[in-house]
Amino acid sequence: MVFRRFVEVGRVAYVSFGPHAGKLVAIVDVIDQNRALVDGPCTQVRRQAMPFKCMQLTDFILKFPHSARQKYVRKAWEKADINAKWAATRWAKKIEAREKKAKMTDFDRYKVMKARKMRNRLIKLEVKKLQKAALLKASPKKALAKGAAAAAAAAAAKVPVKKITTAGKKAPAQKAPAQKAAGQKAAPPPKAQKVQKPPAQKAPAPKASGEKA
């Protein structure tokens, strides 16, 4: 890209730092390789010598003679409408946005975050609608088939799945006990059966030493 911003009489510059930071000035005369005589009649900057390192050249150029007086500079400035043109540039908008961001509080940052989330959600919804419309327009048969498959899958997901035993057979459905009508007494629980103990076997008495076995 060819460089087109040169130091010349009538060039409008942005003051980046110093006592007049953030203001626009016009170069009236070049003093030497380090300084220039500038004037800002519409930005409250008096005519003075200013170093080049605190100026950033813009694309705007005013037409007035060399070392012109302030009234000629003012007339050329107002005729070119420099203030309105500068406010419409991306450069000025970025500076303004940076200043606003520096002044934001925590609550302001929270509101910005919520607004961004809502914006992104709306954008996603619109993109999905456009994609669906484009799909229907490009291949309506495929879109219908895809919709039918999705409906079948949704219907299959709603059908309850029956339990299958380890042997591969279906488990028998357990019937719930029927509730008795009001007024009927509930059957008593079955009594526990007594378990009969086997008769105890007596040990044989020891024989006398003289007796034969």
Swiss-Prot record:
Residues 191-196 are annotated as: 2 X 3 AA tandem repeats of K-G-Q. Component of the large ribosomal subunit. The ribosome is a large ribonucleoprotein complex responsible for the synthesis of proteins in the cell. Belongs to the eukaryotic ribosomal protein eL14 family. The modification Phosphoserine is found at S139. One of its GO terms (molecular function) is RNA binding. Component of the large ribosomal subunit. The lineage of its organism: Eukaryota, Metazoa, Chordata, Craniata, Vertebrata. The modification N6-acetyllysine is found at K79, K85. The modification N6-succinyllysine is found at K85, K202. Residues 169-188 are annotated as: 4 X 5 AA tandem repeats of Q-K-A-[APS]-X. This is Large ribosomal subunit protein eL14. Transmembrane segments: none annotated.
